[in-house]
């Protein structure tokens, strides 16, 4: 907990120190963000990480290396009305 506190304090000092030297808030914020980071790059990375529909409709669910077929694919449940 103490480490998190000191990290927070140091980040506050790191952000506010340039302001005391006459810097503008926008310049300080821009200094924290990499130059090559653009909204298009962020959107592209989010889209590439999204799961495709094929992954969502997968027929098997595996838990602890034990894979069970999905309910709609189990043949023993069909016709038991």
From Swiss-Prot:
This is Consomatin Ro1. It is found in: Secreted. GO terms for molecular function: toxin activity. Keywords: D-amino acid, Disulfide bond, G-protein coupled receptor impairing toxin, Gamma-carboxyglutamic acid, Hydroxylation, Secreted, Signal, Toxin. Expressed by the venom duct. Belongs to the conotoxin C superfamily. Consomatin family. May represent a new lead for the potential development of an analgesic that acts via opioid-independent pathways. The modification 4-carboxyglutamate is found at residue 58. Residues 23-57, 71-81 form a propeptide. It comes from the Eukaryota. The modification 4-hydroxyproline is found at residue 69. The modification D-tryptophan is found at residue 64. It comes from Conus rolani (Cone snail). The cysteine framework is C-C. Residues 1-22 form the signal peptide. Moderately activates human somatostatin receptors (SSTR) with a specific activation of SSTR1 (EC(50)=2.9 uM) and SSTR4 (EC(50)=5.1 uM). In vivo, does not cause behavioral changes in mice within a few minutes of intracranial injection, but causes a progressive loss of movement thereafter. Four to five hours after injection, mice recover, even with the highest dose tested (5.4 mg/kg). Shows antinociception and antihyperalgesia activities in two mouse models of acute pain, most probably by acting outside the central nervous system. GO terms for cellular component: extracellular region. Disulfide bonds join 62-67.
């Amino acid at each position: 907990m103490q480490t998190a506190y000191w990290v927070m304090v140091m980040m506050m000092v790191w952000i506010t120190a340039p302001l005391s030297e006459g810097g503008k808030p926008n310049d300080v914020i821009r200094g924290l963000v990499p130059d090559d980071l653009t909204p298009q790059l962020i959107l592209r990375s989010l889209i590439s990480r999204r799961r495709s529909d094929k992954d969502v409709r997968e027929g098997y669910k595996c838990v602890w290396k034990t894979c069970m077929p999905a309910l709609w694919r189990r043949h023993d449940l069909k016709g038991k009305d």
